[in-house]
């Protein structure tokens, strides 16, 4: 082979959305690079070296120095190899590719990740015929944590560990984001000063759509000041909003009245006014996994405290450990009533009585491990014949049903297994009566054998331990939580990262919901808009869209404190959902729902579209129009009771239609209003005669637009 038979061709790899990097604006360029080189246009070639700034960001070269660029410094033959020489940047991945004229395709020949800066070489075995080669550069994320090796090098982190920041158990991506947020300057690992980057308004609004019931102007300003990471730190240790207390605040002592309206009133008061928004959103998400429902269940529906007490269980553990939450749910009288393991008796074959299997089935299928064995990335495991592997069978259900026998009423009325109780007594946990608990061994999930001779409570402990130790629980529940906060179709890498935190929070603890929630919200796929292209994001729940609208404009009435006159019977019909009002234990929608059309053809899911029927879309639009125009008055209440949005700020902008729409875009759609929608709203606003009508028209059109309905 002569040197002339090897033709080098240089090509740079462009940054792709979703590549491993801290990229909060979704521009495809690392925020760290942008802060090192502030104000540069990615499309420009500032130093005139023939490479635009975006390409230099990928290569890690200096966009202000025309001599700093990716180039082949030399090519020589050594034995039977062609040796390429170039100057590398620490943490960047370099690949020599060869072109195949027969197929027209390039293939990787040799790859290395630069462990040091300066001269680099790669030796490529050379064929006898002429070859065309190219040198490509890309970012590399060896530990899969969402920060690339170049960024980790700047911070002094390691690309071999996702928890190398020295900040306890915090993931490196989250630590990197916190490092960059704020004002003033920070020092990189080599002592280089770098200006910090406080989050911009649009990023904060989008984040609050994911992590709260929606931002209002004050909350948005606060998060812009303390940073997304700073707000997360505040929220992970707040005082607990207890809905029973909220209900009692509105309704007097526990037995004063149990009218179900007060549950909804209490929920709304918490969602609209409480500061611990992250915990409340997690409680709402958990209520759609560990489902009980007032729909068609008089005991639950007719007593506001029964509903609130169950919700309190979810809130109490929402940032705690899932194993503890699962235990309290298993013992809750509300769940015992709903899934019929309250007064579930031991077997008596002589009369054909066997334990009820309802709760035993659903605690596996819906609350912990699902139907099919999963890999850590959520994909199904397959047997040797390529078939999905069930996690359990009917025998397992029958054995698990034996575990959940012997429960009777607890509290003051729980004097025996057969004692009855009124509705208020349902707020007390169930009590185990061993005389009605199934004796003997129980062969349950994961080949676990619960020994004979234990108490009922010991059997339950063993069963819950087995479920929470099962490898399925991490990817199964993590996916359900991701779907409630950030996206319907998480990539395998996203789900794998979150499931890894479920399996180990950094201290060896499994099921730490606080750590899992931070992993969900502070993942690069959550913090980077459209990280997974047009498969990113989710359709927002209609009920939460209503709450977000009311919060954005601080809807209140003249009462101090405000009251929330919400009729519980109207929203399921209008929106297809209301907290604790699912039509079945399977929630309002299935996590794998695939609407007909393009989504199904592409293998994508959209759970929320299962309740998007034509009549609900029309009724929901009419209701939102009524709320915007008149306020929320489902009881046709006196004017003093009606919740009215405060439109004073947008009304002050109404003389300038473009300024008005831009303000609402930043508040409601995080700057993502499409140009066509923006122009249509401006034209509609200009056609209105008064400031009031201009604002109402603009708000209505925006909240009904895809840009508000779909979170990207």
For each predicted feature, which ranges?
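Bacterial N-terminal signal peptides that target proteins for export
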Residues: 1-7
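Bacterial N-terminal signal peptides
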Residues: 8-17
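Residue-level detector of buried hydrophobic side-chain packing
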Residues: 11, 33-34, 53, 96, ...
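Short, composition-biased motifs enriched in small/polar/acidic residues
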Residues: 19-193
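Sec/Tat-exported extracytoplasmic proteins
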Residues: 33, 37, 55-62, 67, ...
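N-terminal mature-domain "stem" immediately C-terminal to a signal peptide or N-terminal signal-anchor/transmembrane
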Residues: 193-239
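Active-site substrate-binding loop specific to GH73 endo-beta-N-acetylglucosaminidase modules
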Residues: 196, 220, 224-227, 236, ...
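Flexible, low-complexity segments enriched for small/polar residues
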Residues: 205-212, 290, 470-474, 478-507, ...
